[in-house]
């Protein structure tokens, strides 16, 4: 097999793509299901393709190579009082920037200002013809050309290999405060989520926790404001303000997926608050299944224990009409409702005419 | 062709196919009045099924079509093509669903931008993107051109608020992407479609995210002796860690126009006015306004005017949002530019635009979204003077090249349209252009959807307009 499989520059990545008939770029493989592809596909590691290329704090933007661990970026941003508002997942586990874009995964903080798709500005990527192309821009506002950077969010590397990504960032809030609210079951939790989401409080994160009994609500802003707002929230629902240590434990646990079954399937489901109860009921019938509802009830992460046949989950999600993608473990890649319009094939053909990257079905 | 038009008329009965010259005249131009082109016919569908039938007809007949909302495109995005039809979407105005629990609205493409927020207002929700034309522009047009507005730094552009799109593609295929959830599974098709300038088809039903209206605002207007001082104030605000909802600057000429048009009042003797707006909970705004006011006070303004109530805030915004049309009163014709530069180079960009304007002998008014580096130089000219339009376009071209040189973009929110056709290849190399053309061909193998926008089209270019808008010539509208 031609070498090298660990390109260190965008040009080397393009060369590596060109020298393999079938290829997929992988980062730290924190979402291993996404790179579980047929054996004839060469896996290109982006571990050497790392580093921050440009960071201009006054522009609210940075550009980094695709294999850069998100943790490194978060540290560089924090030194300048900035952050990635979508709360990247698997941060401490080593997730890369490119992997985060291709998987389209955002953490609890995406509730306030949006997810990966809302902060990506530009990319350099290698298409199926082996060409290194720049799309989008490096400024916070740009609408010249087609928005391929957004399209590549959630594209699983099936349309091209990311070399470099430019993101918008925000100044970090002065303070944060987490409340743990009691919610007796899914329906009660859904009511808390929807009421808090529509409130004046401007919550930063709003999650129904995997314990099935509580809602984690995070506020961000000037410290004095958070105290006043939290008193109002605790007058509305029973609960408590968590100490900074407790709060960090909760959010880290969620961000790093430590609540999930080790080795079992982990499935991301796009939902709305009104299906939370139905989703809970559907997964409760699958023995020992765990569920984390994030982003104010807009995404569910379902964790199956290894003994549960994934087809059972797929069947239930399809029954509810919910689209889903498997991130970890042994379950069908598209684990929920799915439509495959003709245009999907035509766009795949346009960007990858020789089928160099895995099919969207693999 | 007459036979084809006859069959077309059957798809939109009751006289909703316009073919008479005086009917076509009203559609010859959009807000980029320097260009005009007369289409073969205007089809006015009343249902999304009729839109699908029209597009399928066009596909079958290889007939080019241009979708049009309110025709407010500043880049000529809805300029008709002479060998095709216009599909006017103004009658598709239903808000099909407004769900305050999920905080979404599902709308037809002809719904006017501000009507969404008006419908959501009883639930204390709103639709965030607010282009200056929000009172008349449609959501379909906003989607096609990924419209911006004054609040993009914090809230993003149209694409950031689109959750789902049902669209008819130029092949006649009807697709549904995304849905009511704020999260997506698989590639972001809605993101790709948004900003495709009508080249990927027509959105039939759009799911918008609604946000809770901010509880409290703090809007400050500050006047400065020089543009540079206003720019420095922006840098200081950005460096402070505050995240304002809006950061806007108007220069002396733009101020003069706003005063004349809407009787806006600004501190006398100012070369620039800065508008900064904080928003959030009352507690957060109370804490942040102290910091903001201190930063502005330290930036040595001639005068600083915080809005004391909602009325004063609206007055500040009215002056800002009327600036384009107000500048129109200063001059018979003008071109609005939409380049973006890195924020730290705003001062340099403005100085060089000023120098170029002086060299060319043209007046340029500047209104811009300082928070995101999005410039809107308005080049004033008199189209009746021989060569004036050409000189203005040459200046506009130099400004765009300047933006590219500085690492920015030729368009922040108006799109490429026909206006910036020549400049897209300056931002993207031949292979990148080829990639985009391959994508376009995937969506539209026949090249019938809004041809000649974003990418040049072989064949007859649009006629260029000199002097008055065709409707003014016809006595239908006037500028007083």
Locations of the language-model features?
Chain A
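A conserved active-site cap/scaffold subdomain adjacent to cofactor or substrate pockets
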Residues: 176, 182-183, 191-243
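N-terminal glycine-rich flavin-associated loop
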Residues: 1-23, 46-93, 105-138, 173-181
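Short, conserved charged micro-motifs
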Residues: 71-73, 186-191, 224-231, 275-281, ...
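Conserved glycine-rich FAD pyrophosphate-binding loop
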Residues: 37-40, 47, 240-362
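Short cationic amphipathic helices and targeting signals
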Residues: 3-6, 62-64, 177-182, 212-225, ...
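FAD-binding subdomain of flavoenzyme oxidoreductases
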Residues: 86, 93-206
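Glycine-rich beta-strand-to-loop/alpha-helix junction loops that act as flexible
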Residues: 24-31
């Amino acid at each position: 097999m031609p070498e090298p499989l660990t390109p260190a520059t965008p040009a080397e990545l393009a060369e590596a793509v060109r020298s393999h008939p079938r290829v997929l770029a992988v980062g730290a493989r924190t979402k291993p299901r996404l790179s579980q592809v047929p054996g004839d596909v060469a896996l290109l590691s982006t571990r050497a393709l790392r580093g921050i290329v440009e960071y201009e704090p006054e522009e609210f933007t940075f550009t980094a190579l695709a294999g850069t661990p998100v943790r490194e970026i978060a540290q560089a941003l924090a030194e300048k009082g900035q952050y990635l508002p979508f709360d990247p997942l698997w941060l401490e586990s080593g997730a890369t920037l490119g992997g985060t874009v291709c998987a389209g995964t955002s953490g609890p903080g995406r509730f306030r200002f949006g997810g990966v798709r809302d902060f990506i500005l530009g990319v350099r990527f290698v298409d199926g013809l082996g060409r290194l192309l720049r799309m989008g821009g490096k400024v916070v506002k740009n609408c010249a050309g087609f928005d391929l950077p957004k399209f590549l969010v959630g594209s699983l590397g099936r349309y091209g290999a990311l070399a470099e990504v430019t993101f918008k960032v925000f100044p970090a809030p002065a303070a944060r405060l987490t409340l743990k609210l009691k919610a007796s079951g899914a329906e009660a939790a859904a009511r808390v989520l929807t009421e808090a989401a529509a409130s004046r409080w401007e919550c930063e994160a709003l999650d129904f926790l995997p314990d099935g009994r509580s809602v984690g609500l995070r506020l961000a802003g000037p410290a004095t404001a958070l105290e006043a707002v939290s008193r109002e929230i605790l007058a509305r629902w029973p609960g408590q303000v968590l100490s900074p240590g407790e709060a960090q434990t909760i959010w880290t646990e969620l961000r790093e997926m430590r609540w999930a079954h080790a080795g079992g399937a982990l499935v991301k489901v796009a939902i709305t608050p009104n299906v939370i109860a139905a989703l809970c009921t559907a997964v409760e019938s699958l023995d020992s299944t765990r569920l984390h509802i994030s982003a104010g009830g807009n995404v569910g992460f379902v964790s199956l224990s290894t003994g549960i046949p994934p087809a059972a989950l797929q069947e239930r999600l399809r029954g509810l009409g919910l689209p889903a993608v498997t991130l970890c473990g042994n379950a069908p890649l598209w684990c929920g409702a799915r439509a495959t319009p003709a245009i999907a094939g035509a766009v795949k053909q346009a960007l990858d005419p020789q089928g160099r990257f895995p099919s969207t079905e693999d | 062709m007459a036979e084809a038009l006859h069959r077309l008329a059957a798809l939109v009965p009751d006289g909703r196919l316009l073919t008479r010259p005086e009917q076509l005249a009203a559609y010859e131009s959009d807000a980029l009045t320097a260009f005009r082109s007369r289409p073969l016919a205007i089809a006015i569908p009343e249902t999304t099924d009729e839109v699908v039938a029209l597009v399928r007809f066009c596909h079958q007949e290889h007939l080019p079509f241009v979708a049009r909302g309110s025709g407010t495109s500043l880049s000529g995005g809805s300029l008709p093509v002479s060998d095709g039809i216009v599909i006017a979407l103004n009658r598709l105005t239903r808000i099909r669903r407004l769900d305050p629990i999920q905080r979404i609205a599902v709308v037809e493409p002809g719904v006017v931008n501000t009507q969404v927020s008006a419908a959501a207002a009883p639930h204390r929700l709103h639709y965030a993107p607010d282009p200056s034309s929000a009172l008349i522009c449609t959501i379909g047009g906003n989607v096609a051109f990924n419209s911006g507005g004054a609040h993009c730094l914090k809230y993003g552009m149209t694409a950031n608020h689109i959750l789902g799109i049902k669209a008819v593609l130029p092949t006649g295929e009807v697709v549904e992407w995304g849905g009511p959830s704020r999260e997506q599974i698989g590639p972001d098709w809605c993101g790709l479609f948004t900003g495709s300038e009508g080249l990927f088809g027509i959105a039939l039903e759009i799911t918008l995210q609604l946000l809770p209206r901010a509880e409290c605002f703090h809007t400050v207007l500050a006047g400065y002796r020089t543009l540079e001082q206003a720019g420095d104030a922006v840098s200081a605000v950005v460096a402070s860690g505050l995240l304002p909802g809006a950061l806007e600057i108007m220069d002396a000429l733009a101020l003069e126009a706003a005063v004349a048009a809407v009787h806006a009042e600004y501190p006398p003797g100012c070369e620039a006015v800065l508008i900064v707006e904080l928003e959030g909970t009352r507690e957060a705004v109370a804490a942040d306004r102290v910091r903001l006011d201190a930063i502005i006070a330290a930036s040595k303004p001639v005068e600083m005017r915080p809005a004391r109530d909602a009325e004063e805030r609206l007055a500040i915004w009215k002056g800002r949002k009327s600036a384009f049309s107000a500048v129109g009163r200063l001059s018979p014709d003008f071109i609005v530019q939409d380049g973006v530069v890195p924020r730290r180079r705003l001062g340099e960009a403005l100085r060089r635009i000023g120098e170029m304007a002086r060299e060319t002998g043209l007046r340029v008014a500047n209104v811009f979204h300082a928070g995101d580096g999005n410039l809107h130089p308005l080049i004033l000219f008199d189209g009746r003077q021989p060569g004036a339009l050409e000189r203005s376009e040459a200046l506009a071209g130099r400004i765009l090249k300047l933006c590219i040189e500085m690492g920015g973009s030729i368009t922040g929110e108006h799109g490429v349209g026909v206006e910036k056709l020549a400049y897209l290849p300056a931002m993207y190399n031949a292979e990148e252009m080829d990639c985009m053309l391959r994508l376009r061909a995937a969506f539209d193998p026949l090249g019938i959807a809004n041809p000649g926008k974003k990418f040049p089209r072989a064949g007859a270019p649009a006629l260029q307009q000199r002097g008055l808008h065709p409707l003014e010539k016809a006595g239908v509208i006037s500028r007083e």
